[in-house]
UniProtKB/Swiss-Prot annotation:
Disulfide bonds join C39-C81, C49-C71, C57-C79, C61-C80. Its main location: secreted. It comes from Arabidopsis thaliana (Mouse-ear cress). It comes from the Eukaryota. Keywords: Antimicrobial, Disulfide bond, Fungicide, Plant defense, Secreted, Signal. This is Defensin-like protein 108. Residues 1-20 form the signal peptide.
Length: 89
């Protein structure tokens, strides 16, 4: 009888701990939130990165109100602007 009560108590603790994980307001769910980006398509996007630095891309994005910009090799050296996170109320 004691073993049964101990077993049920253990199961109850495990089940309740799985359902009670807290999440943050800015990133609901689990894992790491990937950064939101807008990549400039076509020749304009590659032209901004053709100098070998991200300076032109960064200036392009900042002037247009984005949080920043970088050249990414996995998008064929395209300029990608970082979208600022939404403001929390």
């Amino acid at each position: 009888m004691t073993s049964l009560i101990a077993f049920l108590f253990t199961v109850l603790v495990i089940v309740s701990s799985v359902h009670c994980r807290m999440t943050t307001a800015s990133t609901p769910g689990y894992g790491i939130k990937q950064e939101d980006r807008l990549c400039i398509q076509g020749q304009e996007g590659t032209k901004l990165c053709s100098s070998g630095t991200s300076r032109d891309c960064l200036n392009f994005c900042l002037i247009r109100g984005y949080a920043g910009g970088s050249c990414y090799a996995y998008t064929l050296d395209q300029c990608c602007c970082r979208i600022p996170p939404p403001k929390l109320k």
